[in-house]
Amino acid sequence: MLLCSSVSGRSSQSGIFRDKTISSFSLSRSWRKSVMASPPILSLALPSDTGRVLSIQSHTVQGYVGNKSAVFPLQLLGYDVDPINSVQFSNHTGYPTFKGHVLNGQQLWDLIEGLEANDLLYYTHLLTGYIGSVSFLNKVLEVVHQLRCVNPNLTYVCDPVMGDEGKLYVPEDLVSVYREKVVPVASMLTPNQFEAELLTKLRIGSETDGREACNILHATGPSKVVITSINIEGNLLLIGSHQKDKEHAPEQFKIVIPKIPAYFTMMKFQTYCLLKGTGDLMTALLLGWSNKYPNNLDKAAELAVSSLQALLQRTLSDYRRAGFDSQSSSLEIRLIQSQDDIRNPKLTFKADKYT
């Protein structure tokens, strides 16, 4: 069992801010004037009504995937968001070429040590998306542990990006790490159909199967599960489940989602890995709204789906207006242009509760 301790090996501090008071007897008056305590981090000293999010995801200079899809929407919803970029690429890899760097586990830990050294590790939420190696995922688990040492009430929202439509984007050995180590410590999971099947070892061929997959995941750890897309007999569904306590059955619901005839930007890692900017956005919206409606996951999902669908429709409309074929183009989502739909979505999709 891991014990809570300072990541840098120094003595842990009793509060969020270290005492930087300097004895007046040890310094001259002129020197005392030049030595001042660091100003407080206002997002810590004066926290918002929403929270403070650490988001560990990919990043591209151009385009909207990973943190580029998640940070701005969460900020619009009132959150302070600190991004750590697991990769930094010039653009998504659907282009003829790309340049950039991949963060390794030690580099991630260096950043955590830097935050800890200045007592900046207090977060209300951790958000993770695409992770490309077992070593990096194991280091993320250490980050989860350390953040919960600082804030035991930390909410960990995990998008277990592994694959889609029967194909893995990541090394196969990541699946067991997600199933055995990550799921038990997550507060909310947002897998797609294929990822839910991998995590539960259950083939999802019906709504009943989707609900049972949520139950299996609840039994392992997370209180909230949203399977963001399930294709059943030509219909696309979102199935959500909230187990408020272990003594009662979870509250479950579905939202029917229209199919949009377009291929939105997916980010490839290595040969097979795809990371959808729309999926990253959806998980961020679910985090944002579920925190505002902590006991109404169905309401949070309605708002998230309504925002996302409005954004996708705007993206399609803008590309068509510019003369592009939405059937054949790899589209970049119109995130900035859709900020009103993110901040104040028109509720166009309703959840149907299972009884």
Residue ranges and their predicted role:
Residues L2-L103, I342-T355:
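Glycine-rich phosphate/adenosyl-contacting loop at the front of the ribokinase-like
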Residues S135-Q146, L236-L238:
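Short Gly/Thr/Asp-enriched flexible loops that form oxyanion-binding sites at enzyme active sites
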Residues A284-K292, S306, A310:
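Short glycine/serine- and small hydrophobic-enriched flexible loop segments
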Residues A37-L42, D298-T355:
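Charged C-terminal helix
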Residues Y122-S133, D159:
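Short acidic, glycine-rich surface-loop motifs adjacent to enzyme active sites
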Residues L168-Y272, Y293-D298:
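Conserved phosphate/ATP/ADP-binding segment of small-molecule kinases
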Residues G100-E116:
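Glycine-rich, highly charged phosphate/nucleotide-binding loops
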Residues L147-Y156, T220-S223:
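A short helix->loop->beta-strand "cap" motif at the edges of active sites that frequently abuts
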